[in-house]
Every structure is written in C-alpha cells, then in structure tokens.
Amino acid sequence: MGHIMTYINDCQGVGKTTLTFHTVWRLHEKGYRILVIDFDGQGITFSSMCGLDTGILKEKVKEKQSLYHVFAGDCKVQDAMISVTERLDVLSFGMNLSYMQPMTSIEQFRQLIDEIKDQYDYIFIDVNSSPDWRYALILSVVDYAIIPIDCSKSANLLDCMGILNIISSIQEQFHSHVQILGFVANYVDDNDIQLYDDFKRRMALYRYKVFDTYVPFSDVIDAFTDGPFTIRQKQPVYDLFDKLIEQLAII
C-alpha cells in the first residue's frame, strides 16, 4: 500500500511544486514506483516540470481522458494515466480549474484512491496554488502533509495558522487521518539563516517539527527539462533531498 503525501500551504510561492518534483525525482531514482496526481491546472505544474509536452495533456483533455474527466465519469482512472517512465505515472487535470465548482465528493475521491494505491510505493498530490474545494479533497485522502515555508515571509506561528486551521477543519469535518510531518524551510538564503533558526525555536514551543534540512535558494535548480523526466542536476541538491527524505522517514 502506497504512502500518500502532499506538500501543502495556503500561501503562494513557497515552492510546493518544486519540492514535490525533487522529492519524487529522488525516490524515483531509488527505484520506487510513484504516482503524482497533479491538481494544479495552471502555471508551473508538476507535469511541465517533468517534461511532459503540453500537447500530450491537451490531447488527453480532447479525448476526455484527464483527471477532470475521471471525476466527470467520462473515463476510467487507468485511461487518464500518463506514463513518464516505467516507474512514474502522472494523473493530471490538464486544465485550469480555479473557477470551476466542486466536481466530485470526498467519498468518490477516496474510492478512486483506493482503486489505485496498491499499485504504487508513493502517491504524491501536487496541490493548486491557492486554497479551494480541491484542498478538502486532497487532505481527505493523504496520509502525510509537509508544510513548506519561506522564512522571510513566515517567521512566526501566526503566519502559519491559515494552513494549520484548514488541516484541522478537514480532520474534524471529514474524519481525515492526515498527519502533519512538519515544516520544511524552502528558498533559504544567507540572510534567512537567523530567521530559520528563530522560526524553528518558536515552533518547537508549540510542538511542531521543523526539519533540520532546509533548502538553500542557491541550490534550487531550474527544473524545466528537454525530455521526459530528465534533469540538469547539481550534487548539492541531490544530497540535500536524500537528507530530507531520511528526515521525512518515508522510506
């Protein structure tokens, strides 16, 4: 049975998709079978980061074989899968859903996940940039949530209350078993080290974990690629995400 995970925050620009991409890439390199459900239908999506041609996504939508059409009852989930490599599949909306009404119930989404979760070691859900009805769906099925933060913007607990309240509300309303693994500091530069240390101390007072491994801004590479799931990788990022995965305790 696969672990179901998400990097989630109600703030934009904290690197949710970037962290998802690098974590998935590293687990993929270790030989694990992974599914990424791409809930973000606009901007820099996981699908675009791993080198999927936009033409493939458009063709899937045209043929009514996207996650949107799975929810609409137009196709089966297996028909909507896009195989990036033999160990990595992507299930994408392929369109902008930010202005659409809720398309499926939480129970239906849970049933969909139950159909496929045993086929993978890990299922990562890449969330949309801003909270909407999709957050309830995502948090109702994931086992673990990791909250990425930008220390220069989120230097205290008050700045993180939005996503913590959202998670708490979903847990209560929909009997979600999601567990918060902790906070990971992303896009940290030399000027943010003190802010990171201060944030870590403050969150410890409230018994929230902040991972020792933070992501330096200088080591976050351009993840756009020329081919399916190839990457111009730098060794510091390679080592860094190995350490982060170890701290997440997901292997």
Which residues make up each language-model segment?
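Walker A/P-loop phosphate-binding motif and the immediately C-terminal alpha-helix
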Residues: 2-42
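Phosphate-binding loop that captures ATP/GTP phosphates
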Residues: 33-34, 41-89
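Beta-strand-loop-alpha "switch" segments that mediate conformational coupling across diverse proteins
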Residues: 187-229
